[in-house]
């Protein structure tokens, strides 16, 4: 793929890049989306759980997302009973109104992850950069990762990547 003279190509395919980036692995995450019109949460709520930190995020129309399981597996089969019970029980402990919620969706996906669970920037060819391994932190760390990538493009180094402890692979 050629983006034209002077252009950069950024590869942000997640696990789709695994054939070119062998260190990537998938970490299974499961999510429960429920409709609970009797529950009123205004902000995402993080929960401490024995196996992994969970969260409940309110969405418009009385919908809530309970998620953030992390299972060391690249299995994309349907959600397990154990994880589903953990997600729904966590919601119920936050508000008893979740006991009458309707399950809208149970989903499973894999998070692209590197050995240290931190994202990395990788120069794969002249003017080509792979950005990957965002693990559980995708939407939270993506703006800083973009800033680090742009520093690398503009200055050929990234003080921000160093400050954040991000790997820069040349």
Regions found by a protein language model. Give the residues of each.
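A conserved beta-strand/loop element that lines the FAD pocket in flavoprotein oxidoreductases
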Residues: 1
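C-terminal catalytic lobe of FAD-dependent flavoproteins
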Residues: 101-170
């Amino acid at each position: 793929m050629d983006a034209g003279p002077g252009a950069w190509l950024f590869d942000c395919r997640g696990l789709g890049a695994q054939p070119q980036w062998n260190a990537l692995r998938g970490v299974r995450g499961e999510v429960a989306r429920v409709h609970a019109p009797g529950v009123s949460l205004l902000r995402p709520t993080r929960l401490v759980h024995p196996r992994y930190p969970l969260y409940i995020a309110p969405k418009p129309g009385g919908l809530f997302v309970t998620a953030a399981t992390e299972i060391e597996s690249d299995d994309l089969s349907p959600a397990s009973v154990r994880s589903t019970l953990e997600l729904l029980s966590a919601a119920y402990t936050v508000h008893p109104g979740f006991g009458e919620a309707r399950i809208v969706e149970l989903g499973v996906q894999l998070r692209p992850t590197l050995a240290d669970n931190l994202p990395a920037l990788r120069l794969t060819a002249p003017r080509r950069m792979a950005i990957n391994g965002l693990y559980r932190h995708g939407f939270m760390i993506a703006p800083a990762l973009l800033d680090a990538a742009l520093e690398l493009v503009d200055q050929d180094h990234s003080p921000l990547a160093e400050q954040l402890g991000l790997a820069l692979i040349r």
